[in-house]
Design a protein with these regions (language model features):
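Boundary at the C-terminal end of the N-terminal hydrophobic targeting segment
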Residues: 30-32
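Exposed beta-strand and adjacent loop surfaces of beta-rich binding modules
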Residues: 34, 48-52, 121-123
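Beta-strand signatures of extracellular beta-sandwich domains
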Residues: 52-56, 67, 125-127
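Glycine-rich, aromatic-bearing surface loops/beta-hairpins
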Residues: 113, 119-123, 128-167
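Structured domain cores in non-transmembrane regions
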Residues: 58-120
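Short amphipathic, basic-aromatic surface patches that mediate peripheral association
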Residues: 34-45
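Bacterial N-terminal signal peptides that target proteins for export
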Residues: 2-18
Length: 167
């Protein structure tokens, strides 16, 4: 008996893939917007500060790193809340690092965040540390809501004010 290879319709899986991609692209979860975070540092009289800005969900679970200011990895452990929470995130530093921020200077970074995260109990946190000075875990905690956009939050030690803007 001569068996022929069975002919398959290759367009069916392709159509399913395209339909799924379109559904995700047009779902509310797929829409995102730039969020600009600005942190104005105090004139605290020390070396440049290391800062870690990261996102927490409504249950207090780490979601992702938004930015890390300060390039020497050996000092990242001083950003203690972020360091502990993000330890399992292999991508935590991919494309989100820059120089430390000097006393009296401003850090301004932009990250894309899904619209579904806004007004859903999420929070932006910033840890801060400076050489030979106290570490300041969760220096600033800002609820990610439309009502808090543009409202300055005061830091505990190094940050004069921190705000975020929704674009």
């Amino acid at each position: 008996m001569n068996k022929r290879p069975r002919k398959t319709n290759m367009s069916q899986p392709l159509l399913t893939l395209v339909a799924t991609a379109c559904a995700l692209a047009f779902s509310p979860l797929a829409h995102s917007r730039p969020v600009t975070l600005t942190a104005q540092l105090k004139n605290y009289g020390g070396d440049g500060a290391y800062l870690a800005a990261y996102l927490m969900d409504a249950k207090g679970v780490y979601v992702r790193t938004l930015w890390v200011a300060g390039g020497k990895a050996k000092y990242h452990k001083h950003l203690s809340d972020w360091y502990k929470l993000s330890a399992g995130d292999a991508k935590r530093l991919n494309g989100v690092t820059g120089a430390s921020v000097g006393a009296g200077r401003t850090l301004k970074v932009t990250a894309d965040l899904a619209d579904a995260l806004i007004d859903a109990g999420y929070e932006i946190r910033i840890d801060a540390a400076a050489e030979d000075m106290r570490d300041s875990p969760s220096e600033v905690r800002i609820p990610l809501s439309k009502a808090n956009a543009g409202k300055p939050q005061t830091g505990k030690q190094y940050i004069q004010s921190a705000t975020f803007q929704l674009q």
